[in-house]
């Protein structure tokens, strides 16, 4: 379902940061200011948001992977819930330096986490001493918190979706270094440089964050569904006509 400008207004997407903290590179997306707060031009935001969703939809239709990134308190739960709904990996605790640029090291940690989960499932912790079991549980909980959202990623993602580019500048820098497209919410206090699909908007309000994230997840789900429908149509011959058995005696 398409998001309207009214929904963006109700979610507070148009509220930027204090004027004294602005980044001049966001000037093209600013409508004006009120009470020393910059007001973002939603007539610019809405089509750019839709462009970002179109890209996410196409990427998902081609079986691409989009990594969701949002580690701020007000976005953690939303990022995890929507990424899981879309069947995509996510980072909602802390971005570990090298998650993209040093993926080999991350794979070692992922293997460790999976081995520990398998050991727990097999009941191996029951044979440990209380102290060993406690240390095991602590290590596994720590790994689940930091990399649990990416344990099934399998490799470098095809794109990343970021809420707040300033807070996650290391993630953006790593993606830029590897040529991974970046979809991101950019507020008035940050630069849109290095972002392939800019969504000018409030990156702090929970309702705004929920709106962007749900939209990206919806686009992914829709893209995958469209891809499945195309495969089904192709299997049927492409024209959707029903197969009619011809009686040889007719």
Curated annotation (Swiss-Prot):
GO BP: translation
InterPro entries: Ribosomal_uS2, Ribosomal_uS2_bac/mit/plastid, Ribosomal_uS2_CS, Ribosomal_uS2_flav_dom_sf
Record key words, sorted: Ribonucleoprotein, Ribosomal protein
Top-level taxon of the source organism: Bacteria
Record's keyword annotation contains Ribosomal protein: yes
GO molecular function: structural constituent of ribosome
UniProt keyword annotation of Ribosomal protein present: yes
Coiled-coil regions listed: none
Pfam families per UniProt: Ribosomal_S2
GO cellular component: cytosolic small ribosomal subunit
Similarity comment text for this entry: Belongs to the universal ribosomal protein uS2 family.
NCBIfam families (UniProt xref): rpsB_bact (TIGR01011)
Name the UniProt record assigns to this protein: Small ribosomal subunit protein uS2
């Amino acid at each position: 379902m398409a998001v309207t400008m009214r929904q963006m207004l109700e979610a507070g997407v148009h509220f930027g940061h204090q004027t004294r903290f602005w980044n001049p590179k966001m000037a093209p997306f600013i409508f004006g200011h009120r009470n020393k707060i910059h007001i973002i031009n939603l007539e610019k935001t809405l089509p750019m948001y839709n462009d970002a969703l179109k890209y996410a939809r196409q990427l998902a239709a081609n079986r691409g992977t989009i990594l969701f990134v949002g580690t701020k308190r007000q976005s953690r739960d939303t990022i995890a819930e929507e990424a899981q709904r879309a069947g995509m990996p996510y980072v909602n605790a802390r971005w570990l330096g090298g998650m993209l640029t040093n993926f080999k090291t991350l794979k070692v940690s992922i293997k460790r986490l999976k081995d520990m989960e398998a050991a727990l499932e097999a009941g191996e912790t029951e044979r440990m001493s209380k102290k060993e079991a406690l240390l095991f549980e602590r290590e596994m909980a720590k790994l689940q918190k930091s990399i649990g959202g990416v344990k099934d990623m399998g490799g470098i993602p095809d794109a990343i979706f970021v809420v707040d580019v300033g807070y996650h500048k290391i993630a953006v820098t790593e993606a830029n270094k590897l040529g991974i497209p970046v979809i991101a919410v950019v507020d008035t206090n940050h630069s849109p440089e290095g972002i392939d699909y800019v969504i000018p908007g409030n990156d702090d309000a929970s309702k705004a964050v929920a709106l962007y994230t749900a939209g990206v997840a919806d686009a992914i789900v829709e893209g995958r569904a469209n891809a499945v429908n195309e495969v089904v149509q192709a299997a049927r011959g492409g024209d959707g006509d029903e197969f009619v058995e011809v009686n040889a005696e007719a």
